[in-house]
Amino acid sequence: MVRLNVKPTRMELNNLKERLTTAERGHKLLKDKRDELMRRFISLIRENNQLRKEVESYLIDNLKSFAVAKSLKNSQMVEELFSIPSKEIELFVEKENIMSVTVPRMHMNITSQNENSEYSYLSSNSEMDDVFATMNSLIYKLLRLAEVEKTCQLMADEIEKTRRRVNGLEYSIIPNLSETIHYIELKLEEAERANLVRIMKVK
């Protein structure tokens, strides 16, 4: 603890007591914020881990399906199937405030295009159809995964900032204020006793 360099007066004592009350209130609010951020962060980490497992599993299975589908078609036909995009994707990113943390909220608008493209059930096969279907459903999981991972990163940064502020108040500011208040109270008591002794001597 470090005693603050202030004059031991009643005015300073009152000021320090007000500062201590404010610091203790701020400490409680920051601790509550940190705890709530941690609760939400842990929930998001669980969702992130689950989503990542699902996405990786989907991708591995889809690559296997693609290898099988490709083996049943000649290379030129496969190239033609993927040469023209069948869908147009518009990505919208909004901002949301969670406990003073600005996080992204992502939305997609998917529209079909090139309806007359070379892709058809005649030029494709069931394996290739499964590949396309899986990739279409995977887009939403990938978007949510990106959103959750970014949110986790931003919340982790805010948790660390809040933790440092809580520790600063708990281990430095509040103890220093308390120590200084105690010191001033002792000094004022000494001054009162000395003044009382002088009065008694005069009498």
Swiss-Prot record:
Annotated TM spans: none
One of the GO BP terms on file: proton motive force-driven plasma membrane ATP synthesis
Pfam family of the protein (one): ATP-synt_D
InterPro entries reported in the protein's UniProt record: V_ATPase_D
Keyword Zinc attributed: no
Domain of life: Bacteria
Keywords linked to the UniProt accession: ATP synthesis, Hydrogen ion transport, Ion transport, Transport
Example GO molecular function: ATP binding
PANTHER family membership: V-TYPE ATP SYNTHASE SUBUNIT D
Family: Belongs to the V-ATPase D subunit family.
Record's function text: Produces ATP from ADP in the presence of a proton gradient across the membrane.
Name of the protein in question: V-type ATP synthase subunit D
Lineage: Bacteria, Bacillati, Bacillota, Bacilli, Lactobacillales
